Amino acid sequence: DTFDIIKRITQDTINQVYPHYYPAGVVVFFQEHHNDSNILTDIAQGKVFVVQDKDEYIGTVTIDGNEINRLFVLPQFHKNGYGSKVMDFAEKEIFSKYSKIQLHASLPGKKFYIERGYSAVEYRTKKVCCDDWICIDIMEKRAPDVEKEK
């Protein structure tokens, strides 16, 4: 079902990619942040979208107002344009209602977001498990026609 697909994509991506960028405590933080309850709540509220290519589920994104959350593409599908297609979809959805998009950029995705025109507007740190620290950039992108602030 949808929950199992999203959980698998999210946790597999965190488990395979994030240890190359973060200490163990931060990886645990991401695993726990994207827990069953949060995923189920977002699904129930109609905020979650799944990317499918033929019969394979390869990615997911959550859209919450003007925020892009939980954007993951399975590692074996990286560098094939799927992330860009997911972002194209999410940006189109959000820009139809809002003049700017906001997201929290993890290290693995930061370069991707910069290349898509996002700029860091805030930097946050938080102490997590095992005396490790998570560092996150809050990034924004403005719509080409910045007239409609909804």
Segments (PLM) and residue ranges:
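A short beta-loop-alpha structural element at the N-terminal edge
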Residues: D1-R8
